[in-house]
């Protein structure tokens, strides 16, 4: 803002002078437009509508068009345009769907001229015809474009884009009857204003909404478009089909694009979010901007070159409530700070490294490029004296190939094809993916899936029969035992009745011992015990006991008020039948009279013989509750995902993100998730894993990723007889006048799935061919071939 460079430009006898300057507005600006003499600029927004004079040292407010006591939605502007033939005529697009024209020559304070209320939703764009003084075009969120004759009260024609909303409309500077429109679904349409029934041409320009477009002021047929896919594309519309001739990759969604006057290959862009700067690009050098303006502190909403024949002054409005004039000489040049070296990995692990030839020559002590074969590829071309660049440095590209044994990516492909990310319970997903990783030799990944299963999956209820069977047979198909130890390591008194009979001086109560959730197993037909509320976070635990030497426990971490747990009866198999201690059952019968034990519990508390092969004692309850919150492991899992992403295994990060869903998604910011998703999808598409890529896009909850499947798809059809491309006008070939893809059964055109015989090439609708071959094996076309549907 403090730069004081001055410029004086001669324009048809007059001169534009000024400096880099700004002024504070009363409210954020949504759009700006410049008068044809470049002396005034209009600023419009939801709460501002003013005209400023552009003087040599500052902006001076000339007129406030928001008049009246009551605020009106007609003054809430989404766009504004100043007529380039009549300096008194303006038009605004209101957020309530009203198009308003303003006549600055009216003597009253209220300059409002006409209101057009035909749109049903917000009007995004208004545009005057460049040579016809009374023609105004508008595009709205309702999907319609309307052409108004300012001498009439209603629109003269309506254009339907067959889409959700229109984002931009622009009249062609060179073609009198042509205008372009951009849409939310990524399409660009070209219309003839004389034919409102259908567009002249339509093509998909971007993956996602196309927010802006601009016709080149000199080259007829050059159309620049910008969209949410962070790209600016230049199209040649003079050919039979729209041809992309330039593409510029930006770092954020493109909100505005304007060609720079007197510079054929330069255009200016600003972003819709994230990035507040304004960039001027040379489309021949799409990776580094030629100039950058950094004055704004919030999103830039409108840009306009001050004069159609002056490339030095750029005006901009922003949400930071400032209006700026940028002097091109004061712009920063990122190319001066750019790194001239490049590094990139190939699909199969090859590493490419590009460096300036001068650096290579200096390090190797040799002269510049003289045909040295140590650097296999050199980029060098003859410099055009007319180009604005001061010079082009020749670069040397070295390619390093990986070893055949160490660069294989088969594990990535196998993992992507075999992973299951949805459609099953979480435990099954983790088990399946762990098995896949283990079979591919990725033990750390397999262990990670296993730990995720243990952390987030409840162990569930396991019947005593199944539990004993698993323990006795050594099966690993069930859930792992939470607490287990060998009975052989315990004292001999554990199985006697003295373990149940405690003295009155014992501090542990009988109710804690004979709780309703712990009963002795009588046989395999016993009912399951009630479920435990202990979380699955407990991997190991201690068992309650009377002797410290048998049941070691760290008492420092046990709260005195926490509930105590005892051995569940179903996991208490005895080693042998007790026949010589008759006092045991009597003692239990006495315990049945206790108010702490019900009769049913006493009846089932008999000591039945159990198979001696069952030598493990399992505890389904933790000894004490550690009061861990549900999201105790969230930070750990988040760090684990970032670890895998930083190691380059974005496949694991995305897979876990999809499988766990909301359990972990809330702990990772949206931008990081989007970066992981897009990186993984790019890898999948490089390996031609289209189905897996589509599944990842469908399962993603990121808006920027899920919208990748919402872009329109263009299907090109050739005539089956003369091979001529079919036009978009129908299913009849323009050359041979035959219908394409005729069904051999119903003799109608197949506009959907077409199935054909590989032997005779006849076919038709899928359902028709299937039904035909159910009753006959001969071709329905009558060629005599025996067709078979498999």
Swiss-Prot record:
Zn(2+) 1 binds at residues 719, 722, 733, 736. InterPro entries: WD40/YVTN_repeat-like_dom_sf, WD40_repeat_CS, WD40_repeat_dom_sf, WD40_rpt, WDR24. Transmembrane segments: none annotated. Phosphorylation at Ser-155 by AMPK in response to glucose deprivation inactivates WDR24 by promoting interaction with 14-3-3 proteins, such as YWHAG, preventing assembly of the GATOR2 complex. Autoubiquitinated; MIOS is required to prevent autoubiquitination. The keyword Membrane applies. Its main location: membrane. Component of the GATOR2 subcomplex, composed of MIOS, SEC13, SEH1L, WDR24 and WDR59. The GATOR2 complex interacts with CASTOR1 and CASTOR2; the interaction is negatively regulated by arginine. The GATOR2 complex interacts with SESN1, SESN2 and SESN3; the interaction is negatively regulated by amino acids. SESN1, SESN2 and SESN3 convey leucine availability via direct interaction with SEH1L and WDR24. GO terms for molecular function: ubiquitin protein ligase activity; zinc ion binding. PANTHER family: GATOR COMPLEX PROTEIN WDR24 (PTHR46200:SF1). Pathway: Protein modification; protein ubiquitination. The modification Phosphoserine is found at residues 155, 470, 496, 594, 598. This is GATOR2 complex protein WDR24. GO terms for biological process: autophagy; cellular response to amino acid starvation; cellular response to nutrient levels; positive regulation of TORC1 signaling; protein K6-linked ubiquitination; protein localization to plasma membrane; regulation of autophagy. It is an enzyme of class 2 (transferase). The modification Phosphothreonine is found at residue 581. Keywords: Autophagy, Lysosome, Membrane, Metal-binding, Phosphoprotein, Repeat, Transferase, Ubl conjugation, Ubl conjugation pathway, WD repeat, Zinc, Zinc-finger. It holds the Pfam family WD40. Catalytic component of the GATOR2 complex, a multiprotein complex that acts as an activator of the amino acid-sensing branch of the mTORC1 signaling pathway. The GATOR2 complex indirectly activates mTORC1 through the inhibition of the GATOR1 subcomplex. GATOR2 probably acts as an E3 ubiquitin-protein ligase toward GATOR1. In the presence of abundant amino acids, the GATOR2 complex mediates ubiquitination of the NPRL2 core component of the GATOR1 complex, leading to GATOR1 inactivation. In the absence of amino acids, GATOR2 is inhibited, activating the GATOR1 complex. The keyword Zinc-finger applies. It is found in: Lysosome membrane. The lineage of its organism: Eukaryota, Metazoa, Chordata, Craniata, Vertebrata. WD repeats lie at residues 72-112, 118-158, 161-201, 205-245, 249-291, 295-338. Zn(2+) 3 binds at residues 757, 760, 785, 787. A zinc finger (RING-type) spans 741-790. Belongs to the WD repeat WDR24 family. It comes from the Eukaryota. The gene is Wdr24. One of its GO terms (cellular component) is GATOR2 complex.
């Amino acid at each position: 803002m403090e730069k004081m460079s001055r410029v004086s430009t001669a324009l048809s006898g007059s001169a534009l002078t000024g400096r880099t300057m700004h002024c504070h507005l009363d409210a954020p600006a949504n759009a700006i437009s410049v008068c044809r003499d470049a002396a005034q600029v209009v600023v419009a927004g939801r709460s501002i509508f003013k005209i400023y004079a552009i003087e040599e040292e500052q902006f001076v407010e000339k007129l406030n068009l928001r008049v009246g006591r009551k605020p009106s939605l007609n003054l809430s502007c989404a766009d504004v345009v100043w007529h380039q033939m009549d300096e008194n005529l303006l038009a605004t697009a209101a957020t309530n769907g009203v198009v308003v024209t303003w006549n600055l020559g009216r003597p009253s304070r209220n300059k409002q001229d006409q209101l057009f209320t035909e749109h049903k939703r917000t009007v995004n764009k208004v545009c005057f015809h460049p040579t016809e003084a009374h023609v105004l075009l508008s595009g709205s969120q309702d999907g319609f474009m309307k052409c108004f004759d300012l001498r009439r009260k209603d629109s003269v024609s309506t254009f339907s884009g067959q889409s959700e909303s229109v984002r931009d409309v622009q009249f062609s500077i060179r073609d009198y009857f042509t205008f372009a429109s951009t849409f939310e679904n990524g399409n660009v349409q070209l219309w003839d204003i004389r034919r409102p029934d259908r567009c002249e041409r339509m093509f998909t320009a971007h993956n996602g909404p196309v927010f802006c477009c601009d016709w080149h002021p000199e080259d007829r047929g050059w159309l620049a478009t910008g969209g949410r896919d962070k790209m600016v594309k230049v199209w040649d519309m003079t050919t039979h089909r729209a041809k992309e001739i330039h593409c510029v990759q930006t770092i954020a969604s493109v909100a505005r694009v304007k060609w720079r006057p007197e510079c054929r290959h330069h255009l200016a862009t600003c972003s819709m979010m994230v990035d507040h700067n304004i960039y001027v690009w040379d489309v021949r050098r799409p990776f580094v901007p030629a100039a950058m303006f950094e004055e704004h502190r919030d999103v830039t909403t409108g840009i306009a070159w001050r004069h159609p024949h002056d490339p030095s002054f750029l005006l901009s409005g922003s949400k930071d409530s400032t209006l700026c004039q940028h002097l091109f000489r004061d712009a920063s040049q990122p190319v001066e700070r750019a790194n001239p070296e490049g590094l990139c990995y190939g699909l199969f692990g090859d590493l490419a490294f590009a460096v300036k030839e001068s650096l290579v020559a200096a390090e190797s002590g040799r002269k510049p490029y003289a045909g040295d074969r140590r650097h296999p590829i050199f980029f060098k071309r003859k410099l055009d004296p007319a180009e604005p660049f001061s010079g082009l440095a020749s670069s040397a590209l070295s390619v390093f190939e990986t070893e055949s044994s160490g660069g294989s990516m088969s594990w990535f492909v196998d993992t992507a094809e075999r992973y299951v990310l949805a459609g099953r319970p979480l435990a099954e997903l983790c088990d399946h993916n762990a098995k896949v990783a283990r079979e591919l030799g990725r033990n750390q990944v397999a262990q990670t899936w296993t730990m995720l299963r243990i952390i987030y999956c409840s162990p569930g209820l396991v019947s005593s029969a199944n539990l004993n069977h698993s323990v006795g047979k050594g099966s690993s198909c069930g859930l792992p035992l939470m607490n287990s130890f060998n009975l052989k390591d315990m004292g001999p008194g554990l199985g006697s009745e003295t373990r149940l009979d405690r003295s009155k001086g014992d501090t542990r109560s009988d109710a804690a011992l004979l709780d309703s959730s712990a009963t002795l197993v009588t046989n395999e037909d016993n009912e399951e015990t009630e479920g435990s509320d202990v979380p699955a976070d407990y991997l190991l635990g201690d068992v309650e006991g009377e002797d410290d030497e048998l049941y070691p426990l760290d008492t420092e971490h046990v709260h005195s008020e926490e509930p105590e747990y005892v051995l569940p009866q179903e996991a208490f198999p005895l080693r042998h039948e007790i026949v010589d201690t008759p006092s045991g059952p009597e003692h239990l019968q006495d315990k049945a009279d206790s108010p702490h034990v019900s009769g049913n519990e006493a009846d089932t508390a008999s000591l039945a013989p159990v198979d001696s092969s069952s030598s493990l004692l399992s505890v389904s309850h933790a000894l004490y509750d550690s009061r861990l919150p549900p999201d105790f492991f969230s930070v750990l899992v988040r760090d684990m995902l970032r670890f895998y992403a930083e190691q380059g295994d974005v496949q694991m990060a995305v897979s876990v993100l999809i499988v766990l869903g909301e359990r972990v998604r809330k702990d990772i910011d949206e931008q990081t998730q989007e970066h992981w998703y897009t990186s993984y999808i790019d890898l999948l598409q490089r390996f031609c894993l289209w189905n897996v890529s589509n599944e990842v896009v469908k399962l993603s909850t990121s808006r920027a990723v899920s919208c990748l499947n919402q872009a329109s798809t263009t299907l090109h059809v050739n005539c089956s007889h003369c091979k001529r491309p079919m036009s978009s006008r129908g299913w009849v070939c323009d050359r041979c006048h035959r219908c394409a893809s005729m069904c051999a059964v119903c003799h109608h055109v197949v506009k959907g799935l077409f199935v054909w015989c590989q032997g005779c090439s006849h076919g038709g609708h899928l359902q028709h061919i299937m039904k035909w071959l159910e009753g006959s094996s001969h071709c329905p076309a009558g060629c005599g071939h025996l067709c078979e549907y498999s």
